[in-house]
């Protein structure tokens, strides 16, 4: 698998999702990543630290330039806990938990986040504004209600299936209520 191609595809997809979700500075963005799937393997079976680092570093660069915070979801072996900057955990009132990821418990994306973030910690839950799922890792539990599927410009990064979620406020009030237009809500 060509690392330049994976980096280019990651950049294309993330920039496209950010454009479609219109995330603002200070927003939370969750990443679910299976490096095994990117390489054409089965999720959790052929993890690659190099691919995890390539993808996470690329995404951190894109999000950081926009002031958007990254949360990297781990696998079920760490109860899908997430790596965030300590400052983000404190700002959003997130409960820090005690676990340090490994390649096969947390995964390559979490290890990369621990490498590239300034003061990484693990938290149990978040409510992100949007997210990207590379390799069918199931990020929905960490995206705010109401979740709206986003179709990325590419359907795959490497060999991994790619999906994305945005969120919008709940519509309340009933038949007489009026709702503001937003780019996320489908009409």
Swiss-Prot record:
Name of the protein: UPF0340 protein SPN23F05980
InterPro entries in the cross-refs: Antibiotic_NAT-like (IPR028345), DUF436 (IPR006340)
Cross-referenced NCBIfam families: TIGR01440 family protein
Matching Pfam families: DUF436
Lineage, opening ranks: Bacteria, Bacillati, Bacillota, Bacilli, Lactobacillales
Family, similarity comment: Belongs to the UPF0340 family.
Organism of this sequence: Streptococcus pneumoniae (strain ATCC 700669 / Spain 23F-1)
């Amino acid at each position: 698998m060509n690392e330049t191609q994976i980096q280019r595809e990651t950049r294309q997809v993330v920039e496209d999702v950010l454009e479609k979700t219109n995330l603002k500075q200070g927003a939370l963005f969750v990443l679910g990543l299976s490096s095994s799937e990117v390489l054409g393997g089965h999720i959790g079976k052929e993890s690659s630290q190099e691919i995890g680092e390539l993808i996470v570093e690329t995404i951190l660069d894109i999000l950081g330039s926009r002031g958007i915070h990254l949360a990297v979801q781990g696998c079920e072996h760490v109860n899908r806990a997430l790596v965030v900057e300590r400052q983000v955990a404190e700002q959003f009132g997130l409960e820090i938990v005690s676990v340090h990821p490994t390649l096969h418990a947390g995964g390559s994306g979490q290890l990369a986040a621990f490498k590239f973030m300034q003061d990484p910690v693990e938290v149990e839950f978040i409510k992100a504004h949007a997210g990207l799922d590379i390799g069918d890792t199931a990020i929905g539990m960490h995206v705010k209600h109401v979740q709206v599927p986003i179709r990325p410009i590419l359907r795959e990064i490497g060999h991994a299936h790619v999906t994305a979620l945005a969120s919008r406020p709940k519509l309340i009030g009933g038949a007489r209520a009026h709702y503001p237009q937003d780019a996320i809500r489908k009409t």
